[in-house]
Amino acid sequence: YAEEGKKVFAVDVDPDANLGLALGFSEEELESITPISKMRRLIEERTGADKSNTFYKVNPKVDDIPETYGKENNGVRLLVLGTVETAGGGCVCPENVMLKRIINNLVLHRDDIVILDMEAGLEHLGRGTTEGMDQFIVVIEPGARSVQTYKNVKRLAEELGVKEVKVKSSRCIS
């Protein structure tokens, strides 16, 4: 898409963030990217949440974040959102609100190509993080559990209005 002159955002939401390597970013470039979820000051600024305040904005300003905090390589702008990193760390609601709003802004309010690398499983579907997507590509491995997860992803994605759910197999011998 980038070669066609379209604006492309690649958003890494997987806790095992390695989308940048797959897209040709160097390790040095990736080390210079701070995941949005680790930007405490930005999250406090935008959501109004801090340790002394249990209330926060559920619709923070995020439209400038992809350009400001993303890193570009070969016409693709990478944004690393990050995830929860410590057990028992308390509520991460403000961080989750920010991440959902950033994805929502990219998908629903722009005419760009957006590719999300999400964590395997169903949690992001339950949170509605992927609402507004046109298509899902679900990677499965051989085995009944993986196929069952695909069926659940397909059902939940359809409930969110995703038009196409495709499947790609991995680790299969033909």
Give the ranges of each region predicted by the language model.
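Phosphate-binding/switch loop-helix module in NTP-utilizing enzymes
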Residues: K51-L122
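Hydrophobic/aromatic beta-strand patches that form the interior of the parallel beta-sheet core
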Residues: F9-V11, R77-L79, I137, K166-K168
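Generic anion/oxyanion-binding catalytic loop in active/binding sites
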Residues: V8, G88, V139
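Short flexible/disordered coil segments
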Residues: R46-A49, N73-R77, I140-A144, I173-S174
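N-terminal phosphate/diphosphate-binding loop that engages ATP/GTP or pyrophosphate donors
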Residues: E3-N74
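Conserved protein kinase catalytic core
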Residues: N18-G20, T86, E123-L125
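Conserved catalytic-core segment of NTP-binding enzymes
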Residues: E3-E4, E95-S174
